[in-house]
Amino acid sequence: RDWGFEVAVPEAVSCALEGPDQGRKLAEWQAMGLTRISGKAFPANENGKDLFLLMPAGRYGPAFLVTPNFYVLKAYNMSDLYALFIGHVSDRIAYGSGDFITAWGALGSLTRGDIARMQRALEAQGHDVGGADGLPGYKTRRSIGRWQDAQSQPSTCFPTSPLKATLR
């Protein structure tokens, strides 16, 4: 089974659906409009199996539907970016794949302290950010998206300088 697939996520689909605890069957993701960015069909062996949305840079970078094998990679190193790197390198070796199609956006220059302050502000409002450690993991990203939705702001699911000024 593959580790994951780069996908296009329609704006109407909340980035707050990210996380290993929010798996859905492939058909459910497809019904929401998620498609492989390559234009290829998903492998038939993925039908009926749970896949998980991963948006490591929120709306500012590539998005993925990952399989449980992605989380096997994370058993060695809990970093989403580490597991993405290993999975992507394996695809490049096995299939001759190129770069991710979606570009990584400029994410700014927030410090871990900046992100930790935002996390504490979100926690004070009842959000589960996974702990105020200054790292924008999936719980922090989706908490940002939920907060943005509640504020009637476009949800980006990623900490930014403008968000830092708002979330205190």
Which ranges hold each PLM region?
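Cell-envelope/ECM-targeting effectors and their regulatory/trafficking segments
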Residues: A8, S14-R168
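Active-site-proximal binding-pocket segments
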Residues: R1-A8
